């Protein structure tokens, strides 16, 4: 029996590839299952990174072969996949945003708060050294009182047409990081 965290990857698109590489490079983790409605993508990932593949995420949850899943599928699938993971007792790292309907997000938050599993969101900037330094200095009062916060973000290049169709574009997909950074630096809603 392995001491590695057994991870299922749900979604083999742009961010799924990033997660697959990270899992592959982590000596404490192994990719045991990949699921994507585009089964050829899942098959390719399984061939490249190991584990089984399927086009049905329910198979991943029923397998008993995952300790955690990374939800890297299109946004409209996130709530259902997180709910399925919680029901299966599987930990979750979900890409942002969870959903565009605040009612669904609130219901999921309540369920996640009472679950025995960890549900985390992919707000990676909170773990960036420079952002953490700013956060610490703000919290310690070294910078003073923040009265205005300007965040400028750029994507390295334009996203493809297929990606834009399911991602919601730059505003929904990337600007959410800026909102999270604003909350990270200034946790009080004004």
Predicted regions and their residues:
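A contiguous active-site-proximal alpha/beta segment in oxidoreductase catalytic domains
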Residues: 99-159
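Short, Asp-centered acidic motifs that coordinate Mg2+ and/or phosphate
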Residues: 33, 68, 148
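Beta-loop-alpha module in the N-terminal Rossmann-like domain of NAD(P)-dependent dehydrogenases
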Residues: 19, 51-111
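N-terminal Rossmann-like dinucleotide-binding module
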Residues: 1-49, 183
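Aromatic/hydrophobic pocket-lining residues that form π-stacking "cages" and hydrophobic walls in ligand
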Residues: 42, 81, 108, 134, ...
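Rossmann-like dinucleotide-binding domain that binds NAD(P)(H)
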Residues: 159-190
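Short, conserved SAM-binding/catalytic segment
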Residues: 44-51, 111-115
């Amino acid at each position: 029996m392995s001491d590695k965290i057994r991870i299922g990857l749900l979604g083999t698109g742009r961010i799924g590839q990033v997660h697959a590489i990270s899992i592959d490079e982590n000596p404490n983790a192994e990719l045991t299952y990949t699921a994507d409605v585009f089964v050829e993508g899942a098959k390719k990932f399984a061939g490249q990174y190991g584990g089984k593949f399927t086009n049905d995420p329910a198979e991943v949850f029923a397998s008993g072969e995952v300790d955690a899943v990374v939800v890297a599928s299109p946004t409209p699938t996130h709530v259902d996949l997180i709910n399925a993971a919680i029901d299966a007792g599987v930990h979750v790292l979900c890409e942002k945003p969870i959903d565009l309907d605040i009612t669904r997000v609130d219901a999921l938050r309540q369920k996640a708060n009472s679950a025995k599993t960890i549900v985390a969101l992919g707000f990676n900037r909170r773990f960036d050294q420079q952002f953490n330094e700013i956060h610490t200095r703000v919290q310690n009062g070294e910078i003073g009182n923040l009265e205005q916060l300007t965040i400028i973000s750029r994507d390295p290049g334009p996203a493809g047409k297929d990606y834009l169709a399911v991602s919601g574009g730059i505003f929904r997909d990337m600007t959410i990081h800026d909102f999270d950074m604003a909350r990270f630096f200034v946790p009080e809603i004004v």
